[in-house]
Amino acid sequence: RKYYNILMKHRMWLEMKRVLDVIVAGIMLAVLIIPMGIIALAIRLDSPGPVFFRQARVTQYGRIFRIYKFRTMVDNASKLGAAVTVDNDSRITKVGAFLRKYRMDEFPQLFNILAGDMTLVGTRPEVPKYVKKYTKEMYATLLLPAGLTSRTSIAYKDEDKLLGEAVDEKSTDNIY
């Protein structure tokens, strides 16, 4: 409640941020539509399966939404190995490695921004199983929409390396 009251004092800024998100995401999609088409074709030619990876994530007020990314791993990768990917994971496709290196796999999230599920800069769009482990203070992050980028994403840009150093799933969970 305390954090909610703080945010409500800045309600006008949050509404202006939403307008800016829509304008910027729209412009970025207009610029990126042809490269995104080329990426989609490259994914289809590189490995069988869908072009997009879809996954349930948590956004503002704990609402579940479906995040979109370009698929960077073989189809049904979650059935072939750990939920967490690390460097040199054999499930990552050739095109996928390139997309991940330059963060181009996240371009489809611009559609999530237009839909109102995400914002350009916000909190990390987390998987529901990790949100269940949030502390009381961490739940305050759910007062804001999930972001395409965030302070956490920048601070842990080498997330694969960090997670690769975790010994088991329990220690991986503790990172979050």
Say what each PLM segment does:
Residues R1-A30, K136-A140, D160, G164-Y176:
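N-terminal hydrophobic signal-anchor/signal peptide
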Residues F53-R91, T152-Y176:
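Short, glycine-rich, amphipathic interfacial segments at transmembrane boundaries or analogous
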Residues Y4, K9-D75:
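A hydrophobic, helix-centered structural microdomain
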